Structures are given as structure tokens and as C-alpha cells.
């Protein structure tokens, strides 16, 4: 018998109830007891199996991005960028690749309202002919900290108080007062974009710089941008409260219902590219994840379109067990030296092994759709049928060989081991430029959010003064307006 033919699937459902082992179950209502009143007998195997399965049917939720929704579709190349990359899925206009996307909030639990102020996750898994490419981003182009040593503390500060389980402004502002580079992300976090109307009406960003490599081996740094064809829409604070009180899953419902109705969400993919020789020509470090690249100097280049035209079949299998990893790249795309990206390559795979298990890549939603082969073996819940006699390489009895080498960036590294910050921090300029780009009513909403947060009674005078200093260094009038509404004298 083919051991993989009857792999558990609803396609092989019987017309009657069975145990996990396939034995028939004739009573699904009454436990087996001594007489009509009990006690219950341990030999009621199906009862024990049913309860034990129920006790274990949930897996640990994601430590971040726990609340989310997924959908399937395709990515289609619309513009030729083969001069920039040898990635097969970007080979020519018209090339299509199946994808699955997951949108999420970042901080709160799996059942939390989707209307809360938060950064949103925007992750895309491309099932290419050369393996999976995971572009794991957010709806804002920057992040709070540039070094992963601060990442666990960043998330803890944003999450609820471990004593009361209440998210509190004083904790957030206390921690980030030590990270002035976070101000640029706060210019998004306290802005309208972190109250998106739904998932369909928000942008997406790869956040980090990656590298594109062409067939000649020439590399360019690249940033990825998703632009929704239906436009960007946000809610006011009042709308968010009303929507959250009406339906805590409003964004999931909107995504699901839109696809079911044939109103398929679509995003255009754009890239910015930079020659590595130009990295030192800017007044900031282009590989600093707290910075954006100026579009007037590095314009957006159109690449393709993302269309979500299929709802997932099972929420647990294709959303909860769906696993992304920035380490999953394909030939023609490579990592940059971005410190946060470098550590995410490890952390994402590690958290999936903890959350789902060591063989999480064997799950259908995570497995590549192309042929693949290695000697990673066994482990808990291994589902792969393997009949090889050789489980090592190299071997004269196994024809498997290393793949042909593909171009990767040529990079000569040399330097002293050190723990230090980057030379060009420039923490406030871009936050100020963003603030000044807004209309006055949008500026006022941003200031109001700062005043509300800094008015937390546990925010000390010292913390308020630090933040007013940061805001003033970004934009003097912004700092003055916040200070005047708090009756605190600005230090700059």
C-alpha cells in the first residue's frame, strides 16, 4: 500500500464517525457508564481520545503577529527587471507565481480587536520554481530599533504590563526614551496609518534592505513596496472604537467577504534600488532599518502585481500553522548587512520550531511547491515517506549532488570585533520631514496622540522632557506644541 495515498485529508472522509485509528463510533452523545447514572468507564476509548485531542488542539500563539488573517492568490510580473536580478519568478513580464499572504496586528493576542492602534504585518510567501521566497514586512517602512539586541525589550515594552496585563503608555515611553531612533517609527505609529480601515486599504513594505543580483553577479540594494490599487484608508480614533465594539474581526471579515464576492484585493509591487557604491553618499546609513530611502533620489520602479483571489480552506492549517521566515530567499535575491534582518533570519525559524515543531516545513502550507531534497531527517511529527538507504552526503551510492552555484554578492569583510552603534545615526531628520509633509489637521492628530500618551500619570517629568526634546529636534514647532499642551517647557 502506498503509505502517502491515504494521508489524513477530508478527501477520504467516511460517511460515518470513526476514531483516529479508523474504528467505527456508534455513539457520540453518551459516555460509557456503569448503569444509567455512572460512574464513567475508562474503557470508553473514544471519549478519552476526544477529550485528550481537545485538550491539545491549540498550538502556542505567535509571540508577535498573533492576530491575523490569510488569503491566497498570485503574483504577476508586469515590468522587466531581469537586468537587476536573475530570480526566476521575476524573469519576464507575464510570469506568474502562486502566493499566500498573511496580514496581522503585531502586539496583542490572537483574539484581540483588529481596530486597535498598532503596526500591521504584511507577509507574502511566493511559491517559486526555485523554492519559497518569504517577504516578511509591515504596513510601515521602518522599525523602532536598528539592533536585534533591543528587539525582545521592544516587544515587551509594547505588550501589556506583566502584572496587570494592561498596555500602558508609561512603559512604552519609558523604554523608547532610551532609543531616540524610534521617533521615526512613532511618526507612523501615532499617525493615521496605524489605524487602517482594513487590510485591503493599507500599504506594505519589506522594511529591510535586501540585495538583487543579476546573472553577471552585479548586486544592488533593494527595498520593496506594496501599493494597494484601492487606495490607502485609515480610521479616526472614534471610528476605531466604534468598529472594534461592533466586530472585533472586522478586517478579517472584510478580506474574506471581498474575495468571496469576487472583489479581489490587489497591490502593485514597486522597488527602490541603490548601487552599493553609493551607500556612503547619504547623511544616514541606508541599511539602517529606522530609515527610509528618499524617493526623489531613488524613485519607485514598478515590478508587478499581487492579486488575492482565493480564501483559505482552513484557518488553523493555513493561518495558524502558516510560517514565514526572512531567511527564505531564492537565487537572485540576497540579504543585506542590516543588523535586524541578519538576526531575524535565525529568530523566525527558531520561533516556528518552538510554536509548530521541528518539521513545520513539511506542512502543506509551508512546504515548497517545487522539488526539494536534503538529509534533514526524522524528529517529532515527521510526515515524509522516505525509503533511502543513504542518509549522508557525499556518497557513491546516492546520485544527489550539490546544486549549481548561483551568483551572490561579492563582499570583503574586515574589521575589529566590537559592540557599537552605527556611525551615522541621524535619528530625527526623517521624523521631522514626515511631520512637515502632513496637512495641519493630520499634524494636530499626531500631536494629540503624543499629548495623550505623555499625560499618563506615571510618565515622569524626566521622560516627558526627553520626548519633547526628541520631538523638538525633529521639528521645533511640533515639540513646542506638545510642550505647551502639557505645560512643560521645551529644552530646545
From Swiss-Prot:
- Entry's localization field: Peroxisome; Glyoxysome
The alphabetized list of GO BP terms reads:
hydrogen peroxide catabolic process; response to hydrogen peroxide
Record keyword Zinc-finger present: no
Just give the chief location class. other
InterPro entries per the UniProt record, alphabetical: Catalase, Catalase_AS, Catalase_clade1/3, Catalase_core, Catalase_haem_BS, Catalase_immune_responsive, Catalase_sf
> Per its record, how is this protein called by name?
Catalase isozyme 2
Q: Which residues bind heme?
A: 348
Q: Its family?
A: Belongs to the catalase family.
Organism of provenance: Solanum tuberosum
